[in-house]
Amino acid sequence: MIIENPVTPSERVKALRKAIDRKGYARILEAHNGLSGIIAESVQVEKNGETLGYDGIWESSLTDSASKGMPDASIVGNDSRIHTIDEILKVTSKPMVVDGDTGGEPAQFEYLVRHLERLGVSAVIIEDKIYPKRNSLDAKANQDLEDPYSFAEKIQAGKEVTISDEFMVISRLESLISGAGVADALNRAEQYIMAGTDGIMIHSNKSDPREILEFAQAYKGLCSRLGRRPILVSVPTTYNTLSDADLVANGFNLIIHANHMLRAAYKAMTEVAATILAGGSSLSADPVCAPVSSVFATVGFDRITQKDRERAETRRLLNGKTNEPAIVSGSRN
């Protein structure tokens, strides 16, 4: 993949804030490897005379872990995560937000923030659960929350090591996930805002969005009282009866479609594997598979072969000139 509009890491760090400042919100899509990153960056649709696309990329702990065949339970380490992050950054140019799980200890979080900012990541989101975390979408898992004052110290530690003011440290509230309720979420949000967080993500694993909307309404009053309003973040995986427009109307500034690329790929791969077995050959799978030529074009292989042909033609022309007989000037008698 040859990036059409390459950016430096420092430019890329600023890009998420710029997108939100420009239109009030940003909509980003999950990616878990280079190919899914290219798709998240490049897909566009025309709707009502407007060209729609994603404003950035979400690098998810769940889908990064699952793509490696691992559960989302703090098993895949930061070095492996950073390898995937860099893989996606190499072939894209839009801003990236990284799922930082719990962030670990403050010293570990400082290291992560420094590394992500150097790479060109725009923001990291950490959740206020005790390490090792369990994925929030599993309603049966124990979800133990970290002491809010300890978590606030972690936020401060991350903010203190940022190189620029553009890199964002965003706090993810797990109060609704744990059953602690909206009041606990607002109390934690206040502590984290006072600690300097750049954003608040309120998370829920319920299909009913009423708690999310209740929090969003109360958040306005909280920020007015504190005199500071960090961006508000939504991950509407379970309550997606609310449209992106609904979320923006309720004050959300960052909307993350957090795991759909991996889930779609998993379903498609499972089905095509079964189709080949049932059909006795891969012929029956052809209708649900992209042509190899499409994959070549997406990852930039066509560009390489085009350059190969151009260089071969240049060599042919040069060799042709070399093999031409020398023209000797006539001599005087």
Regions found by a protein language model. Give the residues of each.
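Alpha/beta enzyme core
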Residues: 2-256, 311-330
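Extended, intrinsically disordered, low-complexity segments
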Residues: 2-10, 16, 35, 260-333
